[in-house]
């Protein structure tokens, strides 16, 4: 008997152990991402050819404790390597695991390589050569918790590569993951009509057809790891392959199961057909181009097993939520008697089906953790958490309280915004605590920002509420789902003020009291314009005429633009970020503002204040609540440091000058007593700077007018 380890993705262990048991393997023991087993050589060949779930099978040659580099070398040296492969073959070592004396995998691989080469030399042979890319004989080594396992890669290249896939779609599904979906759904145990309405390149259907037609998944592979192993029994292997070929030929002819696949992308459907033809099962599968929402059940009962689009794969989140909701509605109404199995990484999306799951499992699509849910659709199937919606009822009724509130807000604020001369404003700000989001309208786009929920609320609850918000929004405010952008916001905790999201850009031009500003709705957590400072910016513009204006922590320079348009004698704009300084320059150009009187400075604002010896008539500063950027000499906390900051700023203020100080710290407390002793006059001006669209949540808005006493 030989000892083996069958590796597989996390979450496959139970299914793989069951498969190995059915093959006849013994001493089966589940481990992390794989299963140990023993088998005679002939059975090991059969498992390698027929396993639908394993990614790799290795023959364990040595396993023992290892506490030093010397022990590692000795463990590898004691193996009779010339009995396993010829020095005319190339070899490689794939080393996994670190800890203790092994700081990196390269060190471990090098020690084993040295031992192998030395063993060949000491046995009187020339040393074999190492090949890093395409070795004949591959050694697998794993070091964990002081134990070293040295093995031979018995199966060769990853077993999920069956050989039938020509190219992939945008979001390919690995073949062994598709097989595990079929196993865990219960379909493999009782094959029946199978439908995949998001078939992509056809992987789920092809794997199912291979099962139903008794075709070995490894039959089309042209390379295995044991081929250069000196103990390889070629005759036994050829007999097993010949038997598999005979079974496949007979299985296709006898298969009576019907398979149906569709996808909205004609290119993918054509690819699926090519893959099915390569796999020898095209005659068993009916493919067509179709929208999943338009498909009809091809039989009275069957299985619908699919891997629909989700956030990490394809598409806009709000559009996908609508899709999932509509799918759930279609399943409920038209697929009574069917079983549904669905793979999805987003709790929000899968909860939008509004169907009660019989079983919920976890699977990994690569490194991505996914939910794999099973549903039984009865003739009178009901939705979970919501009443069954009669025909014609608005989808916003999923979250009626939220939908009604935001609909009312949007209607009131639209008239106000037109009157004010603005086209970007907030229409909802956690008005209802259960729906803990902010919703901002930017022209004909909407950004939904999810606030971090209290730790006491289960994640599943917050995810479901968020999905309900995104489902209800389009109908409630009359917006296309593809113009809804989702972001997650947390209260600032020791990080920098601005957070970059990705490289994508969705740029718009917004208008505010006659000023124009460039927005980037997707590149950063913030868009380039703080909407709650709208009236503060206008106030700066109203006070700027003929004055020398300084804007610190300027962000994208929007207050500077208002000052310049207001007739400022000069405007100095300072920010630490070169990105935002350039953005500020773009905003000036957008408004036709140019000239030497407009200065842009990229600098650490706190250091710049200390170094500055100029005087200004109007200063606007909106510092971060907290910042510890590597580019700043010191950390900054607005509550802790505001007295010192304002004390330094009034030294730059002309005798009749004014300083507008703003921040967004919750429960900020101005130290008026200390500032008064410093001959600094302080007046809160929240009442004239808090916009109407933010009056529902005034706690984060602090604005002060400061002058010399």
Swiss-Prot record:
Keywords for this protein: Cytoplasm, Methyltransferase, RNA-binding, rRNA processing, S-adenosyl-L-methionine, Transferase
Top-level taxon of origin: Bacteria
Cell compartment(s), UniProt: Cytoplasm
Catalytic activity, as annotated: guanosine(2445) in 23S rRNA + S-adenosyl-L-methionine = N(2)-methylguanosine(2445) in 23S rRNA + S-adenosyl-L-homocysteine + H(+); guanosine(2069) in 23S rRNA + S-adenosyl-L-methionine = N(2)-methylguanosine(2069) in 23S rRNA + S-adenosyl-L-homocysteine + H(+)
Family matches, as Gene3D superfamilies: 3.30.2130.30, RNA methyltransferase domain (HRMD) like (3.30.750.80), Vaccinia Virus protein VP39 (3.40.50.150)
The keyword rRNA processing belongs to this UniProt entry's keyword annotation: yes
Function: Specifically methylates the guanine in position 2445 (m2G2445) and the guanine in position 2069 (m7G2069) of 23S rRNA.
Family to which the UniProt record says this protein belongs: Belongs to the methyltransferase superfamily. RlmKL family.
Protein name: Ribosomal RNA large subunit methyltransferase K/L
Species classification: Bacteria, Pseudomonadati, Pseudomonadota, Gammaproteobacteria, Alteromonadales
Gene it is expressed from: rlmL
